């Protein structure tokens, strides 16, 4: 292992100060006038608590004047006292990069959580604060990333090298869908994946680790966690740590990279907490005044450059199912495709609970996905929209009062809704049914058949939680057999 110039510079530039004030995770430190650390510099101090000594790291956020800097702690400050010595490392927080990080879990500081640090083989560390690629390095993409999930591939096709958002309230299936994407896309991808666990449940992180190990994708994946029980500074920076690892694979190794972030809302929430702790005046709904700026600093680095890409899938919690909330609203502008999960669809047991009418994609256009695919997607949306408009009439007067034409629309819409459901590999442990992967060709043909009325004779329940139309016909044969 070799030290980088950054590490050598940190040792020669080391300056010490003393803690003047501690308020939870916020620490004010006094330094000599000629050795004030720069913004984003990492500071370290030793804490002795219950007879054990450990290091705690801070990040400089503000210069207060009078030789004072205000820093945010990235670990608990229990046991920290006024007058304690703090050392300026002379550089921002940095994380290990390269092939050595694959197959391991790290914290925000790049310290491995599954093995001893000496077992991680790396030759370089990169600072987590980096500039985005310059404009002339960027390269747009319209190539479709096939997932094998019918509702996504048909109605909100994902873009290779694009940014994809999975929006939804609590308990509608965001994390399950992210885990499903890891299983499906990473398994068939062949490149490197990086997962950022931002402010989510530790249990889910453990489940993901076990699942990735069993599915064989762990060896090509680096995981970086800053979970719910971590200080806000950690939750704010952990996405940057993971992104830095992904950037190395893109820029140095010229790889196509998958970046999964769960959950972007927790990143925003941590920024709000840090902003309040720093004494900034809150903005709309209590969020930080620099919300758009913070989101932009992260999202602008998640991009594709000439010849290589970072494809990002981000789960976004929607507070109280309110899509006008500033946190999800700030995320929307950066995305190429949005998949919105509906509580109403989830309540009917239709998973993945994707809302086909509100989900969008930049490449849902005949010049990118082909005329047949586009025409079928439009017809499906038209039928579902017409069915939605008829629901008020049905609620008051009943289905029998509809015209024959409207009855056909409702009947086909119900088949489409059932056919949009699909067994997933992640949910096998709960359902006992193996997941299914459907090609885009079979998906388009299946929904075209429903729209044309070719399968009006098949009962609705035969379309529930199946793969392609062949599975529907097998299911229908079983239903007929059981009713004889």
UniProtKB/Swiss-Prot annotation:
Family under the similarity heading: Belongs to the ATPase alpha/beta chains family.
Residue sites binding ATP per the record: 168-175
Membrane topology according to the record: Peripheral membrane protein
Cellular component GO terms held in the UniProt record: plasma membrane; proton-transporting ATP synthase complex
Catalyses which reaction(s): ATP + H2O + 4 H(+)(in) = ADP + phosphate + 5 H(+)(out)
SUPFAM superfamilies (UniProt xref): C-terminal domain of alpha and beta subunits of F1 ATP synthase, N-terminal domain of alpha and beta subunits of F1 ATP synthase, P-loop containing nucleoside triphosphate hydrolases
Record bears the keyword Secreted: no
Assigned EC number: 7.1.2.2
InterPro entries in UniProt: AAA+_ATPase, ATP-synt_VA_C, ATP_synth_F1_bsu, ATPase_a/bsu_AS, ATPase_alpha/beta_chains, ATPase_F1/V1/A1_a/bsu_N, ATPase_F1/V1/A1_a/bsu_N_sf, ATPase_F1/V1/A1_a/bsu_nucl-bd
Protein's recorded name: ATP synthase subunit beta
Subunit structure: F-type ATPases have 2 components, CF(1) - the catalytic core - and CF(0) - the membrane proton channel. CF(1) has five subunits: alpha(3), beta(3), gamma(1), delta(1), epsilon(1). CF(0) has three main subunits: a(1), b(2) and c(9-12). The alpha and beta chains form an alternating ring which encloses part of the gamma chain. CF(1) is attached to CF(0) by a central stalk formed by the gamma and epsilon chains, while a peripheral stalk is formed by the delta and b chains.
SMART domains, A to Z: AAA (SM00382)
Main location: membrane
């Amino acid at each position: 292992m070799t030290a980088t110039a950054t590490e050598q510079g940190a040792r020669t530039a080391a300056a010490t100060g003393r803690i003047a004030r501690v308020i939870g995770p916020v620490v004010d430190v006094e330094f000599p006038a000629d050795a004030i650390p720069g913004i984003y510099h990492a500071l370290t101090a030793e804490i002795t608590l219950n007879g054990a000594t450990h290091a705690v790291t801070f990040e400089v956020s503000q210069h207060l004047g009078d030789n004072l800097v205000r820093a945010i702690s990235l670990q608990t400050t229990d046991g920290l006292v006024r007058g304690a010595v703090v050392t300026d490392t002379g550089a921002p927080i940095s994380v290990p990069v390269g092939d050595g990080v694959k197959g391991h879990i790290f914290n925000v500081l790049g310290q491995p959580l599954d093995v001893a640090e000496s077992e991680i083989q790396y030759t370089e560390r990169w600072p987590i604060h980096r500039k985005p690629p310059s404009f002339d390095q960027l390269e747009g993409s319209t190539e479709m990333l096939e997932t094998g999930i019918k509702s996504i591939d048909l109605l909100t096709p994902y873009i290779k090298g694009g940014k994809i958002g999975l929006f939804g309230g609590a308990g509608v299936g965001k994390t399950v869908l992210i885990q499903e994407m890891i299983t499906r896309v990473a398994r068939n991808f062949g490149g490197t994946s990086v997962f950022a666990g931002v402010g989510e449940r530790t249990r889910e992180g453990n489940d993901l680790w076990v699942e990735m190990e069993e599915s064989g994708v762990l060896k090509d994946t680096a995981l970086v966690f800053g979970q719910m029980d971590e200080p806000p500074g950690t939750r704010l920076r952990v996405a940057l740590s993971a992104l830095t690892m992904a950037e190395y694979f893109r820029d140095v190794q010229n790889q196509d990279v998958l970046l999964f972030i769960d959950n972007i809302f927790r990143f925003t929430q941590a920024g709000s907490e840090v902003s309040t702790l720093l004494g900034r005046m809150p903005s709309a709904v209590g969020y930080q005044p620099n919300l758009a700026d913070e989101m932009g600093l992260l999202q602008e680095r998640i991009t594709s450059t000439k010849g290589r890409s970072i494809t990002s899938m981000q789960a976004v919690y929607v507070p109280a199912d309110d899509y006008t909330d500033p946190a999800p609203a700030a995320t929307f502008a950066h995305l190429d495709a949005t998949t919105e999960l509906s509580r109403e669809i989830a309540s009917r047991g239709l998973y993945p609970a994707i809302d086909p009418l509100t989900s969008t994609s930049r490449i849902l256009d005949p010049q990118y996905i082909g005329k047949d695919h586009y025409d079928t997607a439009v017809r499906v949306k038209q039928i579902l929209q017409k069915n939605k408009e008829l629901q008020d009439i049905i609620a008051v007067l009943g289905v029998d009062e509809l015209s024959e034409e409207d009855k056909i629309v409702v009947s086909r819409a119900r088949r489409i809704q059932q056919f949009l459901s699909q067994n997933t590999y992640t949910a096998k442990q709960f359902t006992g049914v193996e997941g299914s992967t459907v090609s885009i060709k079979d998906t388009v043909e299946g929904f075209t058949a429903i729209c044309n009325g070719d399968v009006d004779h098949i009962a609705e329940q035969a379309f529930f939680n199946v793969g392609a139309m062949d599975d529907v016909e097998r299911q229908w044969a079983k239903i007929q057999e059981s009713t004889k």
